[in-house]
């Protein structure tokens, strides 16, 4: 059934206007994002095909742009729109009133960063900046790419910490392989960060490696 053959009440846009966004199915939401069908297929047919490709809607957040393009009827433009919508939703989901977040243990911090780091395809080096009450006052990804001592410069980390008047920091990076076991480079970077923190008076509370649904705290393991 082509788009022009669908009754006005069944079209996703009209359904949203009449009944609200909550009334739309996942396929209808995807149809709104990709906007158009093809010469031979309606936008809803293509949207249904996208939903059926994945086990559930949540799995879509881990798909690459190439995986979306494997769906018949999805080119680079439509795939880009889907990726943008997913990324926007991800960013919204991790927004918190950071000044009210208190980190009492590694698990508290991991809950903040795991959704953002666990399934990335590249290594990201991320920092939480805390005040004297261990409240998160700022967070930022500092580096993207392979973690090694030549890329991760303590001065970049602590320059930002000083600018934010942080009393301490917690560092994180992900292993795209899903295995959080630290490498020799991970340990070297951690040692350099801890030493730099001692010099400037800003404590490195922990360096946590994020894997797929698991993590390793280098502080808890006694690496520094």
From Swiss-Prot:
Gene3D superfamilies named among the record's database cross-references:
5' to 3' exonuclease, C-terminal subdomain, Cytidine Deaminase, domain 2
Q: What would you give as a GO molecular function for this chain, any one?
A: metal ion binding
Q: Where does Zn(2+) bind?
A: 173, 175, 186
Residues covered by the MPN domain: 102-224
One family name in Pfam for this protein: UPF0758_N
Organism's domain of life? Bacteria
Motif interval(s): JAMM motif: 173-186
Give a GO biological-process term: proteolysis
Q: Which UniProt keywords apply?
A: Hydrolase, Metal-binding, Metalloprotease, Protease, Zinc
InterPro entries, per this entry? MPN (IPR037518), RadC_JAB (IPR025657), RuvA_2-like (IPR010994), UPF0758 (IPR001405), UPF0758_CS (IPR020891), UPF0758_N (IPR046778)
Family designation: Belongs to the UPF0758 family.
| Annotated NCBIfam families | PRK00024.1 (NF000642), radc (TIGR00608)
Q: What is this protein called?
A: UPF0758 protein lmo1549
């Amino acid at each position: 059934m082509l788009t022009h053959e669908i009754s006005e009440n069944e079209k996703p846009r009209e359904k949203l206007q009449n009944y609200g966004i909550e009334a739309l199915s996942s396929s209808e939401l995807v149809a709104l994002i990709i906007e158009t069908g093809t010469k031979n297929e309606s936008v809803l047919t293509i949207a249904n095909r996208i939903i059926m490709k994945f086990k559930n809607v949540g799995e879509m957040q881990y798909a690459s742009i190439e995986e979306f393009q494997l769906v018949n009827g999805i080119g680079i433009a439509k795939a880009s729109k889907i990726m943008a919508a997913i990324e926007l939703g991800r960013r919204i989901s991790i927004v918190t009133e950071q000044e009210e977040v208190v980190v009492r243990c590694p698990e508290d911090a991991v809950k903040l960063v795991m959704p953002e780091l666990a399934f990335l395809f590249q290594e990201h080096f991320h920092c939480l900046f805390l005040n004297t009450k261990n409240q998160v006052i700022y967070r930022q990804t500092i580096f993207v790419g392979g973690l090694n001592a030549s890329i991760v410069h303590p001065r970049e980390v602590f320059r930002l910490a000083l600018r934010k008047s942080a009393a301490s920091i917690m560092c994180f990076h992900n292993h795209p392989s899903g295995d959080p076991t630290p490498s020799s480079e991970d340990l070297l970077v951690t040692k350099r960060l801890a030493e730099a923190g001692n010099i400037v008076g800003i404590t490195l509370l922990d360096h946590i490696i994020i894997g797929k649904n698991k993590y390793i705290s280098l502080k808890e393991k006694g690496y520094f």
